[in-house]
Amino acid sequence: MHIGMIGGIGPASTVAYYQRLSAAVRDAGGALDLTIVNADVNELLRNNEAGDKNAQAIAYAKLIDRLAAAGAECAVITSLGGHFCFDDTVSLSSLPMISAVTPLDAYFAAQGFKTVGLMGTKIVMNTSLYGQLSQTKALAPTDTLD
């Protein structure tokens, strides 16, 4: 399967996804078929701060179209912070989308966790991971940090 990654939002997470995918495919005896496009982190930050899910989903849809043109069969956003408009992106995407939140939620539930602590960006914490956890509850710090 040719995977399309929207990277560049958090370069460290893009690298981590690449390394883990590459190792998993190699260990399975295959070769990784992957295309990465770089998202504009400044655009993402503006849209995230403004809560403009539609504008960011449109930006992602354009990147996903590039991934599809390169032969990708699915797409993933390589940053949890970039998932604030995931549902909107799914509705505009020319490719099936892979959520980074869904496997986290499933893992927590499989481990028997009903509630998990959450650390992340202000918006991630204020929305309990954008309300995308369906099997577990998220608790985040509520105090304002100086």
Model-inferred region functions:
Residues 1-146:
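Non-catalytic structural scaffold of enzyme domains
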